Structures are given as structure tokens and as C-alpha cells.
Amino acid sequence: MQTVMTNSGVELRVESNIIYTTDSKAFWRSGNMLVGNGTVVSYQCHSMDEAVDMVAALYNGRKTEAAQA
């Protein structure tokens, strides 16, 4: 399981093809679609890494390693 902290303080937990957030939302990949909250976030999502980056962008981006320390 991968975890990513965002600049807005929300933590993303990645399990298989689902991304859970600490504000009780979930996003998942289905083919090349990234779906979350009942809407399509992207039709051109080609990997889970790209999906995590897109979801993190919804929360003002990833917190950098230096900022986490």
C-alpha cells in the first residue's frame, strides 16, 4: 500500500486500482478512465502513478519530501 500526503493535508492511500482519501472519498481506474465521486475525472489516465498525480492535484498537489520531514 502506497500513501501520499497532499499540500491540503489530505492523505491518499493507494490499494490496487483504488485511491482512498482521508476525507472519505474514493477514486479508481477503469481502463483509461479515472473515476471518483460519481464523475469521470479523466478519460486519459494511463497508469496508477498518473492517477495518483491527478488525484493529488485535486488537493493542491503532492507534499514534497522536504516539506514532509
Regions found by a protein language model. Give the residues of each.
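N-terminal compositionally biased, intrinsically disordered segments and leader/signal-like regions
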Residues: 4-7, 22-23, 40, 65
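Short aromatic-glycine-(Arg/Gly/Cys) micro-motifs in beta-strand/loop hairpins
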Residues: 18-39
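Negatively charged, low-complexity tracts enriched in Asp/Glu with abundant Ser/Thr
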Residues: 1-19
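Short amphipathic alpha-helical segments that mediate assembly, nucleic-acid/protein binding
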Residues: 12, 26, 48-52
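Mixed-charge, Lys/Arg-enriched low-complexity segments
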Residues: 35-69
